[in-house]
């Protein structure tokens, strides 16, 4: 087996200027500035084992675990839309296991079992602070945000959990050195859970659950 640990830090600065030469578009010129800090940490672990007690039996096992921590902070300023602070975080992980078993009953009958189990968890987090409220008045109204705050501090959280098992059984009956019969039986069991939440931080530090006015609140 092996283990891998990696870490990276990236800083990005970008300045843009947009000028619209056709006044009939009625679109104002825009200057934007953005500063982005990205952090990423990754851990990877793989272990494998093989067991052969005799010439008729063989067992192979492998497990691969992966854990990631990601964080991105962006400070964005627009001469048209104002200032926005955005923070994105995620700590996804996955565990993948493989099991293979081979059994030779005799010269004419061979069995093989293969199974794979995967667990995956994802939890993306997004937070945006919109300092110039007037530029987002229509959007805030549609989302049902509380307008009496100093700014719009909104959060979206998601939770995605996946659990899947794949397994199959193979049987070979040897008829001759050049021909055989093969029968395969397999199954896939899969389950996924999804949850999402959207809310607003108020100036007092409390949490407000808005009711959107679009799509009848859904």
Please annotate each region the language model reported.
Residues 1-218:
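Primarily recognizes Gram-negative and organellar outer-membrane beta-barrels
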